[in-house]
C-alpha cells in the first residue's frame, strides 16, 4: 500500500520529526513523508501562532501559516491509502491512535498491526476529522516505541501489505473522545488527588461532576506538551 508519514504537526514532538528526517535520508519503498509545521519545528515550539492540529480544514484566504497549511496537507492525504501522523506525549502508558468519525475500518486493522490496539475517535478540528484515511499515532516519550528504528521496521511491514489486509479485529479497543478537562476542573474537583490513570475507569461521581457518561476513562493527564488543559476523558465504544 502507499503510505504518507507526517511528522512535526507539533513542532516540539520529536518522534515524528526524527522519523521523517530518517525517511527522507533513507527512503522506504511506497512510503513518502512530510514535515507538517516547519515553522514551529525551527523554534522547537508546539506552534507559532495557533495549534496546527486544531486548524483543519484551514482558511485559504488567511495569511497565517497554520491556517493555510491544513489545506496543503489535506490535498496530499488524498493521494495515499493510509496516512500516519506521529505525535508524542509525556504521559506514561498512553500509547494509542486517533481516527476521525466515519474513518475507514481498515485504520483499526492498521493500528492493531502496528501494535497499538487502543483507537480513539475524535471529532474536533484535527486532521483525522477531514482525512478519513489518517491515523494519528500517540507515543509516550518513555515508551519503548519512541524509537525511529522500530517505526522504520513497522512502516516497512505495513507498506508491504495491501489495504485489504488491514482487517479490524476484536482485539482493538475503540473509544470516543468526549471531554477535555480544563485547569478549572483541576482546581474545582481537586483532580491531582484523584489518582487518574490512563485508560482506567474514573469514579462515577467524578464523571458526573464533569457531565460525562460513565464509565469514563482518562488520557493525557497533566501532559507537559499541553499545559493549558488537564487532560481528556473517553467513553468506550461497544464492539
Where are the regions that the model predicts?
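Structured catalytic-domain cores with a bias toward divalent-metal coordination
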Residues: 1-239
Amino acid at each position: 500500500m502507499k503510505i504518507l508519514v507526517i511528522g512535526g504537526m507539533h513542532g516540539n514532538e520529536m518522534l515524528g520529526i526524527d522519523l521523517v528526517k530518517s525517511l527522507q535520508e533513507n527512503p522506504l519503498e511506497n512510503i513518502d513523508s512530510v514535515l507538517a509545521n516547519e515553522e514551529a519545528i525551527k523554534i522547537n515550539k508546539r506552534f507559532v501562532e495557533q495549534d496546527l492540529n486544531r486548524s483543519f480544514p484551514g482558511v485559504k484566504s488567511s495569511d497565517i501559516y497554520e491556517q493555510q497549511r491544513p489545506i496543503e496537507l489535506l490535498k496530499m492525504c488524498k493521494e495515499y491509502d493510509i496516512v500516519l501522523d506521529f505525535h508524542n506525549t509525556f504521559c506514561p502508558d498512553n500509547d494509542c491512535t486517533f481516527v476521525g468519525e466515519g474513518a475507514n475500518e481498515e485504520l483499526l486493522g492498521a493500528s492493531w498491526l502496528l501494535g497499538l490496539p487502543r483507537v480513539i475517535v475524535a471529532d474536533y478540528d484535527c486532521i483525522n476529522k477531514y482525512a478519513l484515511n489518517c491515523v494519528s499515532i500517540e507515543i509516550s516519550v518513555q515508551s519503548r516505541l519512541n524509537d525511529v528504528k522500530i517505526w522504520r521496521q513497522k512502516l516497512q511491514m505495513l507498506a508491504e501489505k495491501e489495504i485489504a489486509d488491514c482487517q479490524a479485529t476484536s482485539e482493538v479497543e475503540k473509544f470516543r473522545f468526549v471531554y477535555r478537562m480544563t485547569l478549572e476542573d483541576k482546581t474545582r474537583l481537586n483532580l491531582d488527588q484523584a489518582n487518574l490513570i490512563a485508560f482506567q475507569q474514573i469514579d462515577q461521581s467524578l464523571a458526573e461532576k464533569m457531565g460525562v457518561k460513565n464509565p469514563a476513562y482518562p488520557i493525557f493527564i497533566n501532559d507537559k506538551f499541553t499545559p493549558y488543559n488537564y487532560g481528556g476523558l473517553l467513553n468506550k465504544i461497544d464492539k
